Amino acid sequence: MKRPLVVITAGFVLGEVLALCLQETVYRKCFWFAGALFLAALIARHFLGKDQDRYLGRDQNRDLAGNSGRSVTYRILLLIFMFIFSGMAAGSFLGVQSRNQMDREEDRIAQAEFGDVVQLTGQVMDVREKSEKLEIIVNKVKIQWLTLQFPVQLYGVPGELENWEESLLPGKKVKIACSLNLAESEKNPGEFNAKLYYRSKGVVCTGYIKALKESWGADRPFMRVILRFRKYCSRILEQYCEKEDSSIYKAVLLGDTSFMEADTLDLYRSSGIAHLLAVSGQHLSLIGGGIYLLLRKTIGGFKAAGILGGSFVISYGIFTGSGGSAVRAVLMICCLWLAAERGRTYDSLSALGFAALSLLGKNPYLIFHSGFQLSFSAVLAISGPGQWMIREFNIGKNWKKIVVISLWVQIILLPVMAWHYYQYPLYGMFLNFLVLPFVAFLMLSGIMILLTGGFWPFAAETAANVGHVILVYYKWICGCSMKLPGAVRITGRPGPGQIMGYIVVWGIGIAALKWLMGRKLKGQRRAVFAAVVLIISVLIGFTILSPRPVKGFELLCLDVGQGDGFLLRSGRTSILIDGGSSDKKKLGSRTLEPCLKSKGISRLDMAIVSHGDNDHISGLLYLLEQKMPIDILILPAGGKGGDIYGKLEQMQAEAGGRTYYMHQGDRIKAGEMEFTCIFEKETEKERNAHSLVLCTHYKDLHMLFTGDMGISEETELLKMTEIKGSIQQEHLKHVQILKTAHHGSKGSSSPGFLGKMPLKAAFISYGKDNSYGHPSPAVTEQMKKQNISFYETGGNGAWILENKDRKVIIKRAKTSVPAN
């Protein structure tokens, strides 16, 4: 059996994922079910062994050892199952152990109830100077009576920490006054999951340094040299390169993207060439491989060159921050040199499996890190189907090899990118074909800057100019690709079923290619058939991962902090009602935009603004700045002529959309949803007072969105309901779901107003620990008296209402992978 380590790794990864994602009772059932299947196979093998001649035809097709072909196949399958089950057992054991340990650590810290500032002592593991901050990992942490099992990641501002370059060296013990926070999971779909991210780094809690109290003990000389050399390299790059160029060089050579401008980083990601910014095997092959060959020529022998070269690449991996991609590359290149020294054949897939087991055995949560998944998936694509196709189809020309490798890398990375970034660069493969030939020259120019910058300015400036030309070309080609139609396809976050369907499609596609290899076809004809198989598989795969239309109706009450934000969807129709916050300053970029992308929404059919306060429009302003397509922007008629509404109208026009000022009595239909304005004080210029009050209905489900209307507006609305046949009377008597006005303020939601409707549930959107006292206890108590179920955000996360087959369900919105 070939590559047993690869099979064991597959089982190991499966076991860890099940252990970390599923509830303990569920994953145990999966594990025991797999064990029962394995045991059944062993029993069947034992009792059917005597009769295999009759059932398997052993007398007809025997190998040299006397075994039939079917019997050998059976044994191989049994062996594969055994390796997978063994790996799964080990992976699930480590996964459960890691999850339980981190959960216990969190519980201990949460129960300790430390103050806003704590005195922390521990030993510095690593220090990295980022763009405007320091990142310090502290191990062996003790806070008062509590000793932590896991490291703490602290952040600080260099200018505020006196003599930090000497006091915070790795190995030194420190006493620090800092805040301490447990990392939190995302509150809304698509948001960054800080809890999962820090767990992938082996960290449970973070903090911000207030003061560096004391530092003592000896540092680690090797790490001191690494840190000082990293700072020297950073200074040299800043000295000889333009600001944008130096930031890219720091990412490529030093493994630090924090200095890059957000627009530049987003351009590389959206274009599909962000992998150039990660320290990978290509870096180590060029740098470490060059040194290895030089050592082979100078000192001779595989062993000495391998030891010295291995020491260098390990040091370089530490130098770049020991990220998953860098460690993977270090382990694989060391395997390559070890194989050369032993005179054995190097197998990249087995080396990849060894690297995965080494990293995941130390920290199972690393499996969820986007960098880890992208790095390992890319190498899997190159070493697996890419090399197989090159070998089987006898592809000899280098440009053809690059095309095949690029194609398979994009195929394998598609579901990974869709899961983490909710989008896919449609022209990424072609762009990589145009930029990859210059990567080596870019790296060599950066290395020359570092080598000559200290003593030969002319050479460093020349190298910087060469690199500048390449980077200008990269920026230009990326800009051109982004202007092409459909350059970035919004995929949304695919579900597990979609990903499995994608894997099945490509499994069938590879099987079809293997079948094609067995046919006696001439080279050109075979290539045409292979191209047809690939094109069909690509089209079907894209279709499977495309966003699914909503079945029935879905309302998402976002946790936007102190503000409002609701997303309504039915079929392929998407409506945003408000979208702002007074305490989340980057609501648009960190919450609203990721949420829409994760749902596969690239355009909004309609955006409705109840009124122009910042806590209702800040995120929407960001979307308009980004020129997100919004077909119709609805504004309250009472705000016409106001500065903020004029700004919204202008931005909507620049984005290519229409604006409509809604009056009382207006009705708008969008898909199967209908919106009726039942109250709007057109003559009132005070924003809260002229809030749009919308009755929204989908089939038999009726909802009321109230903006920030107060009790006086509620009283006026109630008077209108006394008029027989009025729209107010007609709509309020059917309302089942309420968006509580003004975040649950005591100045809204009067008992008479709540009692006028047959309410079943209400959403209250507010910020945790807000200074306004929202929601008012009087409001929540009144809802309890009237048997109205209310669902609060308040930092606890988004809520989702689903209406399918006339059944209404309200539940917590699904996020990504649960951390516990």
What residue spans do the PLM features occupy?
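Cap/insert and terminal regions of metallo-dependent hydrolase folds
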Residues: 632, 716-797
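Membrane-interface helix/helix-cap signal primarily in integral membrane proteins
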Residues: 83-275, 590-594, 603, 638-640, ...
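Metallo-beta-lactamase
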Residues: 604-615, 624, 638, 738-742
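Aromatic-rich juxtamembrane segments at the membrane interface
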Residues: 10, 200-332, 337-338, 556, ...
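Active-site HxH/HxHxD metal-binding segment of metal-dependent hydrolases
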Residues: 614-652, 759
